[in-house]
Amino acid sequence: MGMRCIVLEANRIGWGASGRNGGIAVPRYKLTYPELEKRYGREVAELMYRAAHEAVGVLEGIVQHYSLDCGFVRSGHLTPMVSANDAERFSADVKWLESVFGDRAPRVLDRATTARKTGTSFYACAYHEPRGAAIHPLEYCATLAHALHARAVQIHCDTPVTAWHASHSGVVLDTPRGRVHCKQLVIATNGYSDLTPAGRLLSKRVVPVASAVIATEPLPPQVRKEMLPDGEPATDAKRLTNYYRVLRDGSFFFGGRGGASSSASQRIYDRLRRDMVAIFPQLQSVPTRHQWFGMVAVTLDTLPHIGSLDQRVHYGMGYNGRGVALSALFGKQLANQVAGNAPSLGPMSGGWFQAIPFHAFRVPAKHVAISWKQMADSFGL
């Protein structure tokens, strides 16, 4: 017997990061697998490897099960890099995967192959993961919502939860449009947890960081042939990451961290375009068509977290820019958790997800962190 579910959306479907992201699904975390082993041990690193690959598989399974027209493709994924330190990190990752799992799929590409696959000579090498995927995130949200609505799942947009409290029979949620009584509550507010007072208990456990995006006009045919010719999206290895892909209409999508504030000024977009042209000089004369930004939820340990505040209130959040696939996995695991089966995802579900110290000073702290990361990227640290 299934569960009767109601979705309360503060704005409209896909308004937040779920619709604004880069649509890149890759079976990786911010840390490499040897780094995860060093921090948590071999057994946990192996568990997290399996979870990361399961996450992309769950996303693909949802698309196939509901026949969603959202551009999902197992495109592969590139992590280009310029620093020798990053090359060492990812070379160690390749060796670890082969040694521990016999996984020979990922490899580090040389400069010439990287230049051919990316369309630029900017990088020294790249980590190639052939099992990565790409998707149109807003189309995914919209078509999934339509499929669920057709299966009698109630979705109420423009219905922010302003408060919630436990009752003798479950949880009571207050909204401007009425009150909802439920047996179990799942909070999935991520980088927008401070949007209403109801999410502020969890908002202190993540730091929202703006990520800005520009999209060009469709590329001229000759330029289009050069840019990521094998259709693989890319996320570079810098601390202040850039991510990019060629979209289905032939336009070029380029994103990067948008600064410490919760908004993106024109200065941010101008800097993003300068970064894009520095990497891809052939885009100098291609106009920008669209620009937007959204919030990424960052955690202290760079990992997302799934857990419960009590037996009736659950959460999944803090994806650190890896939420396209991992949020699909967390959705599956949250359903199991609501049904009474706690997930086993190592440090992502181990119960440690505390408030960030001095959270009230997060904006000046972000300025300091961004400046340090910019310096580290400049020196290839």
Q: Which residues does each PLM region occupy?
A:
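Active-site substrate-recognition segment that forms the wall
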Residues: 57, 65-74, 161-163, 168-169, ...
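Helical element adjacent to the flavin cofactor pocket in flavoenzyme catalytic cores
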Residues: 88-100, 121-184
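General small-molecule cofactor/ligand-binding pocket signal
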Residues: 106-110, 154-156, 289-291
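Hydrophobic anchor at the start of a short beta-strand
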Residues: 5, 106, 286
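C-terminal catalytic lobe of FAD-dependent flavoproteins
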Residues: 254, 258-379
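Helix-loop-beta segment of a Rossmann-like dinucleotide-binding subdomain
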Residues: 42, 69-79, 113-147, 151, ...
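Glycine-rich FAD pyrophosphate-binding loop
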Residues: 1-20
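Dinucleotide-binding Rossmann-like beta1-alpha1 core, especially the glycine-rich loop
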Residues: 28-112
